[in-house]
Curated annotation (Swiss-Prot):
Single GO biological process annotation from the record: AMP salvage
Family: Belongs to the purine/pyrimidine phosphoribosyltransferase family.
Keywords from the named record: Cytoplasm, Glycosyltransferase, Purine salvage, Transferase
Protein name per its UniProtKB record: Adenine phosphoribosyltransferase
E.C. number: 2.4.2.7
Organism: Mesoplasma florum (strain ATCC 33453 / NBRC 100688 / NCTC 11704 / L1) (Acholeplasma florum)
Pathway recorded for this protein: Purine metabolism; AMP biosynthesis via salvage pathway; AMP from adenine: step 1/1
Length: 170
């Protein structure tokens, strides 16, 4: 399936100079959405994962459906102040500053096999932070899956130590 037909490029959103990839048309097409979920779920099963992890917000849209389809647990990664129980936190560097990602302490069990799912792979900063959160709880990242890859924004060797799925490249 040509998924690019279901992803719109919105120029200068949310700020000038950014070409935003709008996935809402894909979500609004039952066949395209089902195709993405099926492909990601196959990848999760092939990786032997028992947990799917995803960051907010658009990662949740795909990962929750994939977790259901692959019959795995789903663990949320959120920005500070959004999770109600005790969290583990990681600070990571962005191009112009730092950011934090958090998950509930204990949601990843020692030995869990994890696939991380997100909508877009850009610089890789978020995904690298999530890998560290998983490893801090003695989980093992088996693979990473993305709907969209923006290879111009990251090193080609990024994530080479993992199985990687990228459904669309721009």
């Amino acid at each position: 399936m040509d998924l690019k037909k279901h992803i719109l490029n919105v120029k200068d959103f949310p700020i000038d100079g950014i070409d935003f990839k709008d996935v809402t048309p894909l979500l609004n097409d039952a066949d395209a959405f089902a195709y993405v979920i099926d492909e990601m779920a196959k990848f999760v099963i092939e990786c032997g994962a028992n947990v799917v992890v995803a960051p907010e917000a658009r990662g949740f849209l795909f990962a929750s459906a994939v977790a259901y389809k692959s019959h795995t647990r789903f663990v949320l990664v959120r920005k500070p102040g959004k999770l109600p129980r005790e969290v583990i936190d990681i600070e990571y560097t962005l191009e112009y500053g730092t950011n934090h990602q958090q998950m509930h302490k204990g949601d990843i069990k020692p030995g869990d096999k994890v696939v991380i799912i997100d909508d877009v792979l850009a610089t890789g900063g978020t995904i690298e932070a999530i890998v560290k959160l998983v490893e801090m709880q003695e989980g093992k990242v088996e693979g990473v899956s993305f709907l969209i890859d923006l290879p111009a924004l990251h090193d080609e060797n990024l994530l080479q130590e993992y199985k990687v799925q990228k459904l669309v490249k721009y």
